[in-house]
Amino acid sequence: MAEPRVFLKENRGRIEENYLEQAKNLPRVFAPVDEKLQKCTEEVALACKYLYAFMPYSDIGNYPFEVFLDYAENGVRLWKENPQVADLPEEIFLNYVLFHRVNEEEIAQCRTYFRAEIGSRIQGMNFREAALEVNYWCAEEATYHCTDDRTLSAISVYRR
């Protein structure tokens, strides 16, 4: 029988170490975060710690914990429910699936919303098929136009 997969096994130590360093630098900010992490599953707490360990200070100061919790919960859910996601190298998963920021866009809770909007449409598809279907869905729903120096968040583009 195959050994059960451990979420972020290769990067767990690095994440914990970097999170503790951030917490040491910003103790008043991280005290309430630590309290909220205690209410999370081990996997979601580790995903949140990754986000907090590597996000810019501006994100730590400008957005509430619940925004990052949404990203963490959805990342863990994808990892648990989709073997293709779980098979990704951890660095790819951390930087391109879990992480909350692409550019300079506003950070918004959007993954739960988009999962509800498109999840059933791509269920059971392989990565290639799902990527194409998401692109078709995006073309049906929104056309992106850069309006200023900042990039709009995905949810802002969708709601236009």
Please name every model-derived segment:
Residues M1-S120:
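Linear, non-domain "peripheral" regions
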Residues E90-R159:
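Secondary-structure boundary elements
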